[in-house]
Regions:
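P-loop (Walker A) phosphate-binding loop of NTP-binding proteins
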Residues: 13
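ATP-binding Walker
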Residues: 16
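Walker A/P-loop
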Residues: 19
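N-terminal phosphate/diphosphate-binding loop that engages ATP/GTP or pyrophosphate donors
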Residues: 23-105
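ATP-dependent NMP and nucleoside kinases share a basic, alpha-helical "lid"
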Residues: 121-131, 135-171
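Small-molecule kinase domains that catalyze NTP-dependent phosphoryl transfer to phosphate-bearing small molecules
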Residues: 121-122, 129, 150-151, 171, ...
Length: 225
């Protein structure tokens, strides 16, 4: 018996429409664990450690009382307590992303810090929802890539062809074809993900089509319970 028998992971590729599917599921009253939101919260809670490991330039202070401080000033990192004691600090995700995107060694350091905490929080929320004995969903964008969530054994892939993914990323992010193609190809190919899925939600049409596809998926899943 699976540990989380009422859970279904929602995943896909960049540009496939995972967020839209999750919104449609919320509209139908289903509870959803959002791995991205958890990751953002964990990242900010770990601001002190991020500064110690990668540099204080990746931490920003947002307290209104110090809003006029020199934005280029670096925080002291002689101890984590000094940064974590600030009224409101967070990680500059854009700057941090630029660092780890180009530097696998720094990315590995960040992942070693964050991933155990993220996984623990996802597990905690899943255990709470499992106790309700109702169907719920776990939105994990990089489910297949991460290989850290084998305790969830039912997976729905939101699918669109690769050319559609690239076009959407170009439009959404204002990228060139080559840049968008590169981002799409950083992830496991969408055709491989479709082959590994228990359920496929097709998203190549308009929003009404996606509503219909999501409804069909729910009907199949609910009939299996």
């Amino acid at each position: 018996m699976p540990q989380f028998k009422h859970a279904v992971v929602i995943t896909g590729s960049i540009g496939s429409g995972k967020s839209a599917v999750c919104e449609l599921l919320r509209d139908r009253g289903f509870e959803i664990i959002d791995a991205d939101k958890i990751s953002h919260c964990v990242l900010d809670r770990c601001a002190a450690q991020v500064a110690e490991i990668l540099g204080a330039q990746y931490v920003v202070q947002k307290d209104a009382q110090v809003a006029n401080l020199n934005p280029h000033a670096e925080f002291s990192t002689s101890s984590g307590e000094e940064i974590s004691s600030m009224p409101c600090v967070s990680v500059d995700r854009k700057k941090l992303g630029e660092l780890v995107f180009k530097n696998p060694a720094e990315l590995a350091k960040l992942e070693a810090l964050l991933h155990p905490k993220i996984t623990a929080e996802i597990l905690s929320q899943a255990q709470a929802l499992e106790a309700k004995e109702k169907l719920y969903f776990v939105d994990i964008p990089l489910f297949f890539e991460s290989k850290r969530y084998e305790f969830f054994d039912k997976v729905a892939v939101v699918y669109a062809p690769k050319d559609t993914l690239i076009a959407r990323v170009m439009k959404r992010n204002g990228l060139s074809y080559d840049a968008a193609k590169h981002r799409v190809e950083l992830q496991i190919d969408i055709e491989q993900k479709r082959a590994m899925a228990d359920f496929v939600i097709y998203n190549s049409g308009d929003l009404q089509n996606l509503r219909d596809e999501t409804g069909s998926f729910l009907e199949k899943k609910l009939n299996m319970l």
